[in-house]
Amino acid sequence: MRLKAIALAAIPAAFLGVMASAPSASAWSAGNCPVGQFCVWPEFWYGDTDMAPSLTTDEEWSGSAPGHIFYNHTSRDVTMTYVVAEGELQGRTYTTCVNKVSGSYFTMPMHVTDVTWREDDGTPCY
């Protein structure tokens, strides 16, 4: 019985650990991201901005772009891969789907490493 209680207590802790590094689900404005582009900004901002994005692409991309905010200003869903920025070291890698014409922010500094067009397989993109 004691083991079951410990196991049940560990589930919320594990969930919170994953959620701390996940992108926020709230909507974000396009800022200065041109229509038809996927953009990532290196620093946090709110409302409009003239800050230059660290990544602006209209095609599939791989590399490393520092990011706090991202916006998909295209007509297609995107699969985005990112890693937790841990100083000079690379942290855990995550992948998420970004809806067309939507954006959000990371709750901690990240590096976006891959952007690909998502194949429409009928499953929703959150």
How does the language model describe each region?
Residues 27-126:
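Post-signal peptide N-terminal regions of Sec-secreted extracellular proteins
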Residues 1-39:
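N-terminal prepro-regions of secreted/extracellular proteins
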